[in-house]
Swiss-Prot record:
GO MF terms held by the record: exodeoxyribonuclease VII activity; nucleic acid binding
Hydrolase as UniProt keyword: yes
Entries under PANTHER family matching the protein: EXODEOXYRIBONUCLEASE 7 LARGE SUBUNIT (PTHR30008:SF0)
Gene it is expressed from: xseA
Subcellular localization(s) per the UniProt record: Cytoplasm
Enzyme class at the top of the EC tree: hydrolase
Pfam families hit by this protein: Exonuc_VII_L (PF02601), tRNA_anti_2 (PF13742)
Organism name: Aliivibrio fischeri (strain MJ11) (Vibrio fischeri)
Protein known as: Exodeoxyribonuclease 7 large subunit
Length: 449
């Protein structure tokens, strides 16, 4: 027996390993329809079976981690659709399939179509988040695309009436199951876009089997949803039901009722929020007004203390006080003089000589006259000094200055204007006269040359 030069020689185990790698790497994932036979379930929990048709068979294994996700009970003789990868059991050299998922043949075929369309549309970018449109915060009109006799429509309308009874609704009736349903759904979406009377659409129906919901997995529905200029909320079946329409829609709601919750405002909650904000605003306004009132009272008190009339009143009161003190001083002096006269009279009365008495009387009368004259002069002088003091006070009085034809001008901040440099053209200024105020606008300002 002759050998080629440098032949590649395998061991059996090496050959089986190479073949296993070749099968797994080259063939990849396959979908296979067949009938179950020779099903065994050892204590490990793995499944071992044979898939066959009328002409051939292949050994299969489905490990515990994958078979626990199977939703039906496999039995010998049952037709199934499996997703598997090719492999080789090296110890025996047996070619086999490692099953990753298993479904009854009917459901499995639909699931395969679902997965293929999903992958195709995803590759085109129809599921991308950047393609999603933002839902309006407060829709003005909601469109509903569903069966007009289905429970889904009742659920949606019930929720909308409870949350926002004034929200207008437009119903676009369509089939949602069976032959021709997908075309009708696509036409309803197109009709809603052409009429452009709604700013958000709910597309959906109630729960059902995979076949019942299949129209929402059709490519025509998916592409029509993606092309819609109006944002669409999908609401197909129950929370566990997932359709191609859910992936393409701008937002997916788990149920029709949840979709109605999503697109509507809860008016009662909003009214409560508005009432709370109103109470907070009123409280803040009351605090602000109270603070401003206290500040205003303080400013008013300070202004009143500095007001010319207040200063005039203070000066007038001081004059009254000085006048009263002067009158008291004169009265005390008169009383002392009167007391002295009475003492002298008493002393004279105690002297017996008549001549002395007469002379003393004359002297007393003279003294009395002189005293009265002196008192009159003194009183006149005091009154004259008081009048002079009053005139001096009057000359410095702001009110007297105003009475002589002068005026005082303030700017908008209440500050006295003493120079033309303190005003700008267009400023509003207030001029005070003795009998009132005049408000004027500066149209010209010039300095004395």
């Amino acid at each position: 027996m002759s050998l080629d030069s440098n032949p590649r020689i395998f061991t059996v185990s090496r050959l089986n390993a190479e073949v296993r790698l070749l099968l797994e790497n080259e063939m990849g994932i396959v979908w296979l329809v067949g009938e179950i036979s020779n099903l065994t379930v050892p204590v490990s929990g793995h499944w071992y079976l044979t898939l066959k048709d009328s002409q051939a068979q292949v050994k299969c294994a489905m490990f515990k981690g994958n078979n626990r996700r199977v939703t039906f009970k496999p039995q010998n003789g049952k037709q199934v659709l499996v997703k598997a990868r090719l492999s080789l059991y090296e110890p025996r050299g047996d070619y086999q399939l490692i099953i990753e998922s298993m479904q009854p043949e009917g459901d499995g075929r639909l699931q395969q179509e679902f997965d293929q369309l999903k992958m195709s549309l995803a590759a085109e970018g129809l599921f991308a988040q950047t393609a999603k449109k933002t839902l309006p915060e407060q829709p003005k009109r909601v469109g509903i695309i569903t069966s007009q006799t289905g429970a889904a429509l009742f659920d949606i309308l019930h929720v909308l009436k409870r949350r926002d009874p004034n929200l207008p609704v437009v119903i676009y009736p369509t089939m949602v199951q069976g032959s021709g349903a997908a075309i009708q759904i696509a036409q309803a979406i197109g009709r809603a876009n052409s009429r452009n009377e709604c700013d958000i659409l709910i597309v959906g129906r109630g729960g059902g089997s995979l076949e019942d919901l299949w129209c929402f997995n059709e490519e025509i529905v998916a592409r029509t949803i993606a092309a819609s200029e109006i944002p669409i909320v999908s609401a197909v079946g129950h929370e566990i039901d997932v359709t191609i329409a859910d992936f393409v829609a701008d937002v997916r709601a788990p149920t029709p009722s949840a979709a109605a919750e999503l697109v509507s405002r809860d008016l009662s909650a909003q009214l409560q929020t508005v009432a709370h904000q109103k109470r907070r605003l009123n409280s803040a306004m009351e605090r602000y007004l109270s603070h401003q009132q206290r500040s205003l009272s303080a400013y008013q008190h300070r202004i009143e203390k500095q007001h010319p009339q207040m200063q005039l009143n203070n000066q007038s009161q001081r004059l009254d006080d000085l006048n009263q003190r002067l009158m008291n001083h004169i009265q005390q002096r008169l009383q002392r003089q009167q007391y002295r006269v009475e003492n002298l009279t008493l002393r004279l009365n105690n002297l017996s000589p008549t001549k002395r008495i007469s002379q003393d009387k004359l002297h007393i009368e003279e003294l009395k006259r002189r005293l009265l004259d002196s008192m009159d002069r003194n009183l006149l002088m005091q009154r004259h000094q008081l009048a002079l003091a009053a005139e001096k006070l009057d000359t410095v009085s702001p009110l007297a200055t105003l009475m002589r034809g002068y005026s005082i001008t303030h700017n908008q901040d209440g500050k006295v204007i003493t120079s033309t440099k303190q005003v700008e053209l267009g400023d509003n200024i207030t001029t005070r006269f003795a009998d009132g105020d005049i408000t004027s606008t500066v149209t010209k300002a010039s300095e004395l040359s």
